[in-house]
C-alpha cells in the first residue's frame, strides 16, 4: 500500500482526498499559491459536512522541495492538467498517478509527461471549498479506479490505490476496466455542466423535473439518453445510470464547476465533457446532436467574453 502521496491541485475534491488520506499516509499537496501552501502547513485541513475532522499535511508550490512518491492524485481542472503535472512528473517514476478529474483525455495528457503507471479514476464525490483550509463534504460516494491501458498499469496497483483511499475513510472500488464508470460520470457531468453553464442554475431539483413540456429535466433526460446511445454504440456498457446520478445530485443545489467558470469568465472544461462526447460520436460516425449543439453554444459563450475586445 502506498505510504507517500502527492495531491496535485487542492480544490474541493483535492482537499477531500488530501485530508482523508493524511490520516493513513504521508500526504503532500502541490498547489499554485504560496499563501495556500502556508495556510495548509500552519493550520492543516478541516473537513465538515458528512465528516468532521482536521488533518495535518505538508504543502508547497515548489516541486524541488518534494520527495519521490508512491502515488499521485491529480485533482486539477482538465484544462490545467499538463501545466500542473509537468513540474512533478519525475517524482512518480517508481509509482502511479491517478486522475480524479472530469471528462475524457486527462490520462493521455498525464502519460505523455511521466514514466509512472497511470490509473483511470472517476469520482462522484462532491464538496464545497470554504477556504484554503476548510472543505465541506456534500456527497460521500465512491471513486472508481481502473488501469489506463496504454501504460499497462497492473490491476494490483489499482487495488492498492483503492485500498488506501478506503483506509482513509472514503469509498473506492477497483475495476478491471474503468471505462464504463468513466463514461457513466462523463454523460452525467457533460449533461449537468452544460445546462448549468447555459442557464446559470446550480444543480437543483429543476434538473430532474419532467412534469411540464418546458421542464428542464426533460432536456437533461434527452441529453443523458443521447450519451447512453453513443456509449452503447461504442461498445461501452455503463457502470451506473447517469439519470439516477442526476436525480441524486439534483437534491444538493451544488454549483457545477462550469457554472462557476462561466460566472467568473474562466475557461471551462467543455472540451473534455460535452465536447468529448461530440468528438467520440463524430469519430465513430454516430449522431449526438444535442451534446454537439450545447458544446458549440458554450464555446460561443466563451468567445463572447473577448469578442468585443478583439473587434475594438
Please place each PLM-identified region on the residue numbering.
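NAD(P)+-binding Rossmann beta1-loop-alpha1 motif at the extreme N-terminus of oxidoreductases
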Residues: 1-52
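Hydrophobic anchor at the start of a short beta-strand
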Residues: 5, 27-28, 97, 118, ...
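Short, well-ordered alpha-helices that flank and scaffold nucleotide-derived cofactor binding pockets
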Residues: 19-23, 86-90, 112, 275, ...
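Rossmann-like NAD(P)(H) cofactor-binding subdomain of soluble oxidoreductases
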Residues: 51-134
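Helix-loop-beta segment of a Rossmann-like dinucleotide-binding subdomain
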Residues: 91, 134-148, 200-209, 254-264
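NAD(P)-dependent Rossmann-like dehydrogenase/reductase catalytic/cofactor-binding core
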Residues: 219-312
Amino acid at each position: 500500500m502506498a505510504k507517500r502521496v502527492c495531491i496535485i491541485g487542492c480544490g474541493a475534491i483535492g482537499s477531500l482526498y488530501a485530508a482523508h488520506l493524511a490520516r493513513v499516509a504521508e500526504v503532500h499537496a502541490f498547489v499554485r499559491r504560496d499563501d495556500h501552501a502556508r495556510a495548509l502547513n500552519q493550520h492543516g485541513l478541516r473537513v465538515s459536512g458528512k465528516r468532521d475532522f482536521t488533518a495535518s499535511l505538508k504543502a508547497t508550490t515548489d516541486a524541488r522541495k518534494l520527495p519521490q512518491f508512491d502515488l499521485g492524485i491529480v485533482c486539477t481542472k482538465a484544462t490545467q492538467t499538463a501545466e500542473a503535472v509537468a513540474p512533478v512528473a519525475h517524482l512518480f517514476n517508481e509509482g502511479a498517478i491517478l486522475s480524479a478529474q472530469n471528462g475524457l483525455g486527462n490520462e493521455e495528457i498525464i502519460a505523455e509527461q511521466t514514466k509512472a503507471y497511470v490509473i483511470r479514476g472517476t469520482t462522484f464525490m462532491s464538496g464545497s471549498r470554504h477556504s484554503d483550509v476548510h472543505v465541506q463534504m456534500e456527497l460521500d460516494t465512491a471513486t472508481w479506479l481502473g488501469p489506463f491501458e496504454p501504460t499497462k498499469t497492473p490491476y494490483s496497483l489499482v487495488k492498492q490505490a483503492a485500498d488506501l483511499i478506503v483506509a482513509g475513510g472514503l469509498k473506492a472500488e477497483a475495476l478491471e476496466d474503468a471505462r464504463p464508470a468513466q463514461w457513466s460520470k462523463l454523460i452525467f457531468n457533460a449533461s449537468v455542466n452544460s445546462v448549468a453553464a447555459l442557464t446559470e442554475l446550480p444543480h437543483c431539483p429543476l434538473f430532474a423535473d419532467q412534469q411540464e413540456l418546458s421542464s428542464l429535466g426533460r432536456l437533461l433526460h434527452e441529453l443523458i439518453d443521447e450519451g447512453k446511445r453513443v456509449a452503447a454504440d461504442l461498445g461501452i456498457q455503463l457502470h451506473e445510470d447517469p439519470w439516477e446520478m442526476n436525480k441524486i445530485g439534483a437534491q444538493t443545489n451544488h454549483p457545477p464547476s462550469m457554472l462557476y467558470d462561466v460566472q467568473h469568465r474562466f475557461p471551462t472544461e467543455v472540451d473534455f465533457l460535452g465536447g468529448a462526447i461530440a468528438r467520440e460520436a463524430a469519430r465513430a460516425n454516430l449522431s449526438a446532436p444535442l451534446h454537439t449543439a450545447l458544446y458549440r453554444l458554450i464555446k460561443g459563450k466563451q468567445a463572447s467574453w473577448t469578442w468585443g475586445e478583439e473587434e475594438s
